[in-house]
Amino acid sequence: MAVWNPWHGCKKISAGCDNCYVYEKDAMYGKNASVIRRTANFDLPVKKNRRGEYKLLPQEEPVYVCMTSDFFLPEADEWRSEAWAMIKERQDLSFVIETKREHRFFKALPGDWGDGYENVTILCSVEIQRRADDRIPAFLKLPVRHKGILCEPLLEKLVLDAYLKTGEIAQVL
């Protein structure tokens, strides 16, 4: 599984964040996971080896983005346009971005987004029914070509039938 973490750290916003693995792991090393920082691998999608080939090669599986953060954090606003540019440049890769912050979507889009980039899937992360009922209706209104729902961490049974009937959700993880 290919992972690209352009920034690290997050701010807890819901019950699904209470036992966040990033906070636990960072605490083991004496780090504060609530401090958002750009990573050394920020430019991973466009890094090349000595032969001039991309280090991150196309695979059958997509590149998962921000597994130790949230792509739409306001603290990452200053870096996001550069991240979008790398995503656009690497049309040979498929990127999956999961978020609990669909409410920041329009504040964080590149100017040429239109109906979405063909190589980007956005997953709306939900953990309890109340959050699903809050986030998914707003998420369904967003201009995204490839939409999915991520049930993680799953804290209770979710009923998603009404959202799946729209035909806009391509996958539920």
Walk through the language-model features, giving the residues of each.
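Residue-level detector of secondary-structure boundary/capping sites
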Residues: 8-11, 33, 74, 130
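Local cysteine-cluster metal-coordination motifs and their immediate loop/turn environment
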Residues: 6-26
